[in-house]
Amino acid sequence: MSNSAVAKRYAQALFELAQQKNILAEVGADLNELTKIVQESPDFLTLLNAPKFSIERKKQMVAEIFAGATPEVLHTVQLLVEKKRVNEVKLIANAYAELAAKAQGTADATVFSTRALSAEESANISTTFAKLVGKQSLNITNEIDPSLLGGIRVQIGNHIYDSSVANKLERLKRELIG
């Protein structure tokens, strides 16, 4: 079974448990923290994969390191250690985030603009495009792209909505040339 499929199964199980206990946000925050630790300290995964330590010792280390985490996340990480799938942490966190966003009616969007957007502009874009894609709200990430000349380009999942000046000029050029 591919790593992606395994990660989705773990994420689905954790998501269903978190949903039953009404702790989607807490579990998501713990998974984000775990992902951050893994990214900032690759030695952490090396330690959890090291044959030098017994599985029980590794589980004990996880319990000590993540003492403040929700029991669901703690037990999931311990299970990953036991099943030798601790390298799946990032994929599981990403899959969980997708499931939680879908359940909460949110989506991630990247807005490309020639300058940083104000909070009000981000909120307006979120409201407008959330309705367009059938979501309650969008989590906006703003990226500066001077090549747009003006306007914005919004990417939500695989969809791109381009109302940049550069795109409008390109369309006009195509219409005039042929």
Curated annotation (Swiss-Prot):
InterPro entries named in the record: ATP_synth_OSCP/delta_N_sf, ATPase_OSCP/d_CS, ATPase_OSCP/dsu
Q: What is its main location?
A: membrane
Q: Record keywords: NAD included?
A: no
Q: Mind listing the GO molecular function terms for this protein?
A: proton-transporting ATP synthase activity, rotational mechanism
Keyword Heme in the entry? The reply is no
Keywords assigned by UniProt, alphabetized: ATP synthesis, Cell membrane, CF(1), Hydrogen ion transport, Ion transport, Membrane, Transport
**What membrane topology does this protein have?**
Peripheral membrane protein
Q: Where in the cell is it found?
A: Cell membrane
CC terms in the record's Gene Ontology section: plasma membrane; proton-transporting ATP synthase complex
What is the annotated role of this protein in its UniProt record? F(1)F(0) ATP synthase produces ATP from ADP in the presence of a proton or sodium gradient. F-type ATPases consist of two structural domains, F(1) containing the extramembraneous catalytic core and F(0) containing the membrane proton channel, linked together by a central stalk and a peripheral stalk. During catalysis, ATP synthesis in the catalytic domain of F(1) is coupled via a rotary mechanism of the central stalk subunits to proton translocation.
Which family does the record claim for this protein? Belongs to the ATPase delta chain family.
How is this protein organized at the quaternary level? F-type ATPases have 2 components, F(1) - the catalytic core - and F(0) - the membrane proton channel. F(1) has five subunits: alpha(3), beta(3), gamma(1), delta(1), epsilon(1). F(0) has three main subunits: a(1), b(2) and c(10-14). The alpha and beta chains form an alternating ring which encloses part of the gamma chain. F(1) is attached to F(0) by a central stalk formed by the gamma and epsilon chains, while a peripheral stalk is formed by the delta and b chains.
Question: How is this protein named in the record?
Answer: ATP synthase subunit delta
Q: What is the lineage of its organism?
A: Bacteria, Bacillati, Bacillota, Bacilli, Bacillales
